[in-house]
Amino acid sequence: MKKIRPLTEADVTAESAFFMQRRQVLKALGISAAALSLPSTAQADLFSWFKGNDRPKAPAGKPLEFSQPAAWRSDLALTPEDKVTGYNNFYEFGLDKADPAANAGSLKTEPWTLKISGEVAKPFTLDYDDLTHRFPLEERIYRMRCVEAWSMVVPWIGFPLYKLLAQAQPTSHAKYVAFETLYAPDDMPGQKDRFIGGGLKYPYVEGLRLDEAMHPLTLMTVGVYGKALPPQNGAPIRLIVPWKYGFKGIKSIVSIKLTRERPLTTWNLSAPNEYGFYANVNPHVDHPRWSQATERFIGSGGILDVQRQPTLLFNGYANEVASLYRGLNLRENF
């Protein structure tokens, strides 16, 4: 694998600006004239987000022990921590960007079990302590690109998914990996009320091809900014696939199952013409209702400082992952 261009702290997205909202099958958030093509709820979110003082405070996570390998450092500017943890898409806790931080305190993460099953020789289950102690943790500074055409740079902490899968020993029949979020309607109000949860079918499910899951960039993430993930960011463990749109990054995972057939995925089930299975970041393949050619980078500034920049193919990781899709029509397999 070619060496990944380092990101710098200047490129990391502040914690509080992390997630922007889609209502139902939401439209991308825009500014000025571009915003006219987007939903009023998304427009309102953008301006309310940058008011400043009324943003919800992220709960403090416990400090984690981790290494900082040189290969994963970067000169990119980080998104501030309060934006990453205060601006989220996690419909199980509501549709507004501030809802997850305000409502996710009800999520119980201890005890926790993560089951690895399916087409494996050695199925097993991880408990809460295993998530942060079974595999060495490392910090990786990754670009993060939302399908809504905004982006961040985030210092995630976790371990490569391939290490977990290697212990399970996939069989020759394993072709895909299916992921499932916790189903706990009493703790996750969006699962109980279709209005709160955007009308999606729960629990949230996602999937990858096995070769995508085994790629060194694919990260099982347990922390951010040096601390354990807060609930609104997908505690206690979530998936990060940096060359794909953010909705592939399933949160609060309780099941990883290796399968022979391609698994169903939540947003693809909800709107298959808008959200594909692959969801690779691609400036040449627009969403049916907005362009993906550019993105708004959310950094440390306010609304007048939001930077619009070109979208990078595979979110800037083409050298590392383009070979996975050799011969695949990326327009048809979006």
UniProtKB/Swiss-Prot annotation:
Mod. after translation: Predicted to be exported by the Tat system. The position of the signal peptide cleavage has not been experimentally proven.
Comment on bound cofactor: Binds 1 Mo-molybdopterin (Mo-MPT) cofactor per subunit.
In the UniProt record, the signal sequence range is 1-44
> EC number(s)?
1.8.5.-
Any one GO BP annotation for this protein: protein repair
Kindly give the InterPro entries that the UniProt entry links to this protein.
Answer: MsrP, OxRdtase_Mopterin-bd_dom, OxRdtase_Mopterin-bd_sf, TAT_signal
Q: Where are the transmembrane segments?
A: none
Q: What is this protein called?
A: Protein-methionine-sulfoxide reductase catalytic subunit MsrP
Q: Which organism is it from?
A: Salmonella dublin (strain CT_02021853)
